[in-house]
C-alpha cells in the first residue's frame, strides 16, 4: 500500500488524460462522494444535490447527484446525506514547534479539524539547531500524512549576538541554500526584525534578496502603521500581525496580504475580531485576506483548529462561503498553489471536508483517502501516524548547562531602582517599570512589598561561558515555587521564574534531565511537566498524549498564581517585541535595542 504522504498523489501533468476520461464518463472514478451540498470557493456559493468524482487522489469533476449511478454500476460511493462538502483548509502561517509535537503528530490534529495543507515557518528549531534543525523538520514533514510547505526562517537569531545567544545563525547564504535544495521551501518566513528592514539594514536586505532573486514571496511581521510603507517597499507581501482595523487597512492598500490570526481565546493572539473590521466596517475586499492559526499548543490545537478560526470569521460578519474561502482558496492563492489546492475544481487534489451547517468538520479526505470519519481517525491514518520520522541523535542533546548555576541575584543592601518587567494580560507587550525599592531583610519581604518575583534566563546551547541573566517580574502573580521552560522565544534559552532559589533549581534540573521541558515546581517537587526531548522544543509522543500533559500543566500553572499563560511566559525573552525583555545577555530595552542593568 502506498504510504499516506503528500507524494501519494501524482502531479497533475501526469494525470490529465485520465482525469479528462473520468470527467467525460469514459472511465469510472475511484470514488464518488454523493448527495452533498458543495461549497464552491471560486463562486462562493453552496450548490445543492451534487457529487464529487475522484480518481488518483484528484477531483475529476463535480456533477449533479446520481450521475455516477447512471453511468456505472459498482462504483465506490460515499453518501454525504445532504452535508456540506468543501475543500480542505489551508493554513498559510503556523509554527509546528509551538504545538510541542513533531510534524507527523501535528498532522493528526490538523486532519481532525479539516486542515489538509499548512505553510510552516520552522524558525524555532532553526534557532536551536541551525540549518540541520530546519532540514530535520523538512524530512519530518515529507513523511507526514499532511501537505506541509516551508517558509524558510528569515530572522535567526531574532536580534544580534550582542543582545542574545542563539543556537543557530541563518545567514543569507544558508537561506539561499535551503531554497536551492528543497522544493518545499516556497517562501521566506516572517521577517520579524521590521525595524532593521525599514531602516535598510544590510543583512536583513541580503536575506530578502535571497528569496526575491529566486522568485519566492516574502512573509512579514510588523507592528505600527508608520512602518507599513517602507516594509512593503522592501518586498514583504504578507503579514499575520495586523492587530487592529487601521493597520490591516493600511496593509491591504500597500499590497500586503493580511492573514487574520484567530486565537485561541485562552491566549493573547486573537486579533481577528479587530483586524477583520477593515472588511466589515471600512468596506475593504476580502480577496487578499486569509485566516491563520500561527501558534497553538497541543491542547488548543485539537480544540481550536483553523476550522474554529473560520467560524470566528463568520461570527465577525463574513458569510460562511466567504469565510471558508478565506480558510482555503485564499491561502493557496497567496502561495501560487490555487491550481492544486483550495477548491474542488477539476484537477485539484481531492482534499475534502464533510461538515455540518455550523462548519464543524465531521469527515476528512486527504488525497482521496478517508482519514477522518465521524470525528475519529481511520485505521489508514492511524497506520500513517505510527510511521514517524526519527530525528537525528543531535536533536536529543541540545540542553547544555554548567554543572552549577546560581539562579538569583544578591539582595540589594541599599535603596535603589529596579528595571522591572511588568506583566499584564494579554501578555505580549511587557511594560518597562522602574520600581524604587527600599532595603528589606530578605527577598520574600521585598517581593510582598512590591509585587515582584525572580526571572532568570540561562544560555543552554553551550555557546557561551555559561551566561546567566537576572531580572525581576512585577505583577506576575506567582505565589509559590517556580515555573520554567526551554522554549524561551526565540533563541530558546531556558527561562525560569520563581519565588525561591531551591525550587528554581529543581525546575532547571528537570529540564536538563529531559533535555527540554515546560514545568511547574512547588515545595521541591515537580507538579507538572511536559517533556520536550527533541531540540528542547518537541515531544516524541502523539498529539493526544501531549494534549493531556498540557492540560495538567495549565491547571498547575493557574494554581501557582501566574497571571499570564505559559505561552505568554515563553515570550518574555523575545527581544523584538516592546518594551522590555530578558535574554541570556541581560535586560533588553527593545525600542533602543540596548542592554540595561537590573539595579540602578
Swiss-Prot record:
Keyword vocabulary terms for this entry: Hydrolase, Manganese
Keyword Lipoprotein: no
Pfam families cross-referenced by the UniProt entry: Adenine_deam_C, Amidohydro_1
One GO molecular-function entry: adenine deaminase activity
Single biological process term from Gene Ontology: adenine catabolic process
UniProt KW Manganese keyword: yes
Root EC class: hydrolase
EC number assigned by the record: 3.5.4.2
Cofactor(s) essential for the protein: Mn(2+)
Cited InterPro entries: Adenine_deam, Adenine_deam_C, Amidohydro-rel, Metal-dep_hydrolase_composite, Metal_Hydrolase
Top-level taxon of origin: Bacteria
Catalytic activity line of the entry: adenine + H2O + H(+) = hypoxanthine + NH4(+)
UniProt record similarity statement: Belongs to the metallo-dependent hydrolases superfamily. Adenine deaminase family.
Name of protein: Adenine deaminase 1
